UniProtKB/Swiss-Prot annotation:
Major place of residence: secreted
Record region (2 X 8 AA tandem repeats A of P-S-P-K-P-K-P-V): 34-49
Region (Disordered) location: 32-76
Name of this protein: pEARLI1-like lipid transfer protein 1
Organism: Arabidopsis thaliana (Mouse-ear cress)
GO (cellular component) term, any one: apoplast
Knocked-out gene: effects: Reduced cutin accumulation due to lower cutin biosynthesis. Early flowering in long-day conditions. Compromised pathogen-induced (e.g. Pseudomonas syringae pv. tomato DC3000 and PmaDG3) glycerol-3-phosphate- (G3P) and azelaic acid-(AA) dependent systemic acquired resistance (SAR). Increased tendencies in cellular damage after freezing treatment.
Amino acid sequence: MASKNSASLALFFALNILFFTLTVATNCNCKPSPKPKPVPSPKPKPVQCPPPPRPSVPSPNPRPVTPPRTPGSSGNSCPIDALKLGVCANVLSSLLNIQLGQPSSQQCCSLIQGLVDVDAAICLCTALRANVLGINLNVPISLSVLLNVCNRKLPSGFQCA
């Protein structure tokens, strides 16, 4: 039995010496490698604010203000959208006994209500020439009829061109 115990002790010491030798042999006295520094995130570019608006200095030559239209100053264009004048087709149709719906001279006349006679004639002439009304008629006669229905007069010498 003593030989078993001594054999066990000899094996125990042999293994201890082996492990001690291995640990001493692998110790190289090296410093541990330093931890890598984290890569800094890119800094956002500073936002450039637009420069404050400079106070406007009036120019020495201000733009002329267009004077408001007076009853005698007519231009060559209609201040009303010609497509809106399509309601005047019902007025002409009812006068010619063509039933396209309920005739309403009120709608047509209300469109040209605030215009002088020349402007009203220009607007209706534009609508007739563009055939917005959808009826092929003699333009001077149709123009005169539409103006008369709305209690307007065809200006003397006016040519629907």
